[in-house]
């Protein structure tokens, strides 16, 4: 039941020594503030880093040929391993754990740019030769028209799908590129679609500066024979990409007469492995944040307990008078506990709100989509649970002072100075 006199007494007691009360409350509030800010900052950094994985399947890897480092099968070291379309068919038949296999080529090699002409406009873009299944590995969103299909591959059609950046540079805003033509290395292609990606920043702009053409058309139009620049492979659900990668490498080593112990003949980039490393890193950061935050909170709660002990000692005579006038032990205990809970609760709430406001300010300052720090947020349920735990801890912090208070004999308390 609400007792106005009791609450007035609580606030009056805390206000008797404002500096002591402020410093104690600051210790508690600072602990919750630090916990929220550190967790939000960790989440913001994690969001920024993992954003790079939103455009690709994390259970995938990329594999390409390099130079052998060991002699094997009559071949000397330093031999360039050139993968072909035959390797694609072999992987498809002999590695059942590979769900998606996408052989890829890029005009001019990896990272190469090529002059593309449309009317009086010309720019340099990346030209990719791909199969339709590349969409299962890379997060490509077709915004208008369509993507490469099986008939394009079968009939070696001269069709192209352009990125939004290509559209911006070669076409007016009001123009629809679908149905128009562009020229790549003297070969005309009909535009059948426009795509965008799910990645922001520099990487998103780079990906959207690509032009996709059918793999078989690429081979014929640019005299690429049956060579494959690299493979993009996605493993089946439940099968680690590292396992599939090893199966593919073992097969290719046999097909290309490469020493099984030669680790340099094939290069790879395993997204699943990299993603797991990053998740493990941020898992460790989160544990560290909790340890530091909880340690700071515990220090604040201990401070509350110590201050309440001091307050009880200062009020020894007052407690003796109350006991002599018939105050029950529960009345004394509840008074001390309420003072501890009020001090902890108010300090925790202020720390909580200050932390959330700070995160909002940081989010506004780091609003650049190219930033590696994105959306520093914390889970509201977790925040409220932390506040409740803090208040319960505040009650616990008042138990020792409260037990000291009721242990005082009324006669001895009345004699206290």
What is the meaning of each model-derived region?
Residues 2-5, 314, 403-417:
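Short cytosolic juxtamembrane segments of multi-pass membrane proteins
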Residues 6-11, 15, 19, 23-27, ...:
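Transmembrane alpha-helical interface segments in multi-pass membrane proteins
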Residues 11-15, 42-46, 50, 272-289, ...:
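Alpha-helical membrane-interface segments at transmembrane helix boundaries
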Residues 43-126, 130-136, 151, 168-169, ...:
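Hydrophobic, regular-secondary-structure patches
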Residues 69-77, 111-113, 200-205, 256-263, ...:
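Short helix-coil transition/hinge motifs at the ends and kinks of transmembrane helices
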Residues 128, 133-152, 156-259:
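Mid-to-C-terminal secondary-structure elements
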Residues 232-234, 241, 247-248, 259-293:
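Peri-transmembrane interface segments
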